[in-house]
Amino acid sequence: MRLQHLADFKPQAATRAWASIPNPNGLPLIATATSDKSVRVYSLNNFTLHSTLEGGHERSVRSAAWKPGVRTDGALTIATGSFDATMGIWRRKEDAGNGNGNDGGDGPLEMEIGADGEVSKGAQLRRGGEEDEDEGDDWEFSIVLEGHDSEIKNVAYSPSGQWLASCSRDKTIWIWEEIGEEGEDEFETVAVLQDHKADVKCVCWRKDDGNGEVLASGSYDDTILLSREDGEGDWETVATLEGHEGTVWNLDWEPEVSMKTESSDESSAPATPRLLSSSADMSIRIWSKVPTPPPQNKPSYFNPGIPSTMRPGPENETWECTATLPKVHDLPIYSISWSKQTGRVVSTGGDGKIAIYEEQTKGRNSVGGTIEKEWVVLTVLEGAHGPYEINHVTWCQRFDNGKKTPDEEMVITTGDDGLTKAWCIEENVEERTLEA
């Protein structure tokens, strides 16, 4: 296997590009956050600029997140987090819902901020809701969310779209909920988590498995925290994962494709997704929840048939590091991504390398008969952005005419050179370590 350069997204940013986030709703669009205070939305069909979000922030846009699902009026939503300590909500009524992704940003626009402008504490309309002449002419900067005291490092919507999380250099994580009717742009702060002891670098949601959606966060304090809502509206930390010896830069939850096992025991409890983490200690770790037997004669916490006053609160969980991927990187690993199609992992970081790993079966344990697996390196590409650091990597579905199968994936990297690059995967190639 090897990575082959497919395309550069045009035009590139004139300054550092931080991260590129594919649209989660199947649209051929990807949003790139940049240091020039804007977000570029590119078409995945032809790797060209689709539209631009600009005029809403006073400093670098560090992170962007698409809201899952599509509103009934067809509007797309992107949340942005900036070094100016604010988060922005952007709307666009999108013709590109037809899936072609080729329009030049001339689709119908959402020009009005809904309702009477009433917003909750912690949120206010930018400049009283007046149209900003400096804003991009295709996306509307609908609302600004304020509360952080310092740079926002990451923003993320929960899989259901109910929650929006932001983390900051101020050591806090804010969780927001959109409470107004569609088009009203009314947000409420539902929690401010303050359990990290240093700069919080990343947040990553796990979908609801019957126990509520879970938020993982990584920090400069070298720890990972897991938090969730207790059913009464309060959020609390349910697990602390310790083991890294440097800043935790990125997290990703295990996709369903890699959770499938060869076990035929249908009576076993559903597996809890594993958590992937990367760090300044140049390691990539996999964390697994330690199973705990259910308490006897005790109702399930989230059983809707039990009155809330009788349900026990969520108990603390124990997690352990169950695997460490082979060492490839020589500098901090800024970004990782776990493929929803193949279960492979891709990583990148300050050394400019891109590495792809795969979990393979070794055999069965002779004692307990359990399946033994190991992670192997499939390929390493060096100097992918020349001498520049790579800040972000993600798996992404291919939409261009060159794809060989409907579900074919590519790798997207975003770097300090302002470039967003697409890489295709060539299987059955012997070379393992290559230079771009």
UniProtKB/Swiss-Prot annotation:
Residues 98-107 have a biased composition (Gly residues). It comes from the Eukaryota. WD repeats lie at residues 10-52, 56-100, 147-186, 195-237, 243-297, 328-367, 389-433. Keywords: Repeat, WD repeat. Residues 94-113, 118-137, 295-316 are annotated as: Disordered. It holds the Pfam family WD40. Coiled coil: none annotated. GO terms for biological process: iron-sulfur cluster assembly. The keyword RNA-binding does not apply. One of its GO terms (cellular component) is cytosolic [4Fe-4S] assembly targeting complex. The keyword Repeat applies. Belongs to the WD repeat CIA1 family. Essential component of the cytosolic iron-sulfur (Fe/S) protein assembly machinery. Required for the maturation of extramitochondrial Fe/S proteins. This is Probable cytosolic iron-sulfur protein assembly protein 1. It comes from Botryotinia fuckeliana (strain B05.10) (Noble rot fungus). The gene is cia1.
